[in-house]
Amino acid sequence: MAATEQSLAPAGSSAPPSGKEEGAGPSSGTEGDPAGSSSTPEAPSIPDSSNPSATVPEANVKPPAAGSAALDLPIGPAPQGPAPVAEASPRSPPGPGGSRPGPETFRQRFRQFRYQDAAGPREAFRQLRELSRQWLRPDIRTKEQIVEMLVQEQLLAILPEAARARRLRRRTDVRITG
């Protein structure tokens, strides 16, 4: 619907569409229309693909709260030993020089979180919530898949070192079904 409204707007118009972004939730922030005519959140404007001269100024694009909140998270030393931690933005798409950190990296970040590093209980909750979302990805996984990940992680914790090493070498993206 927002794409239809946007195509109806004049090509030179700089007003953003007044629709609700599909992925917007309670954590995406609520900013009203500058004129105060609507209480729906402002969706970032998308350049019109038919008009090559239409560009979106960077100042109007606001990152979602969940994506920007993870940038200031403390990353402490690994309790099981030194583990390399990627310094890439957690929600950024794969770039030409690298790729998005994998679930194991996010699991380690979640497990390495220390309450003492947070500014208080609310900040600790916010950081743990963001770390768990990065690791478990509830936006793309079902509840059953999330529970399976948690059970596997707990099982790995009690396995002997040799079995754990074999399990970590195995490709988890390939599944044999029957």
UniProtKB/Swiss-Prot annotation:
The gene is SCAND1. Residues 107-178 form the SCAN box domain. SMART domains: SCAN (SM00431). May regulate transcriptional activity. Residues 9-18 have a biased composition (Low complexity). Residues 1-107 are annotated as: Disordered. Residues 36-54 have a biased composition (Polar residues). PANTHER family: PROTEIN ZBED8-RELATED, SCAN DOMAIN-CONTAINING 1. It is found in: Nucleus. Keywords: Nucleus. PROSITE patterns: SCAN_BOX. InterPro entries: SCAN-C2H2_zinc_finger (IPR050916), SCAN_dom (IPR003309), SCAN_sf (IPR038269). Pfam families: SCAN. GO terms for cellular component: nucleus. The lineage of its organism: Eukaryota, Metazoa, Chordata, Craniata, Vertebrata. This is SCAN domain-containing protein 1. Interacts with ZNF202. Gene3D superfamilies: DNA breaking-rejoining enzymes (1.10.4020.10).
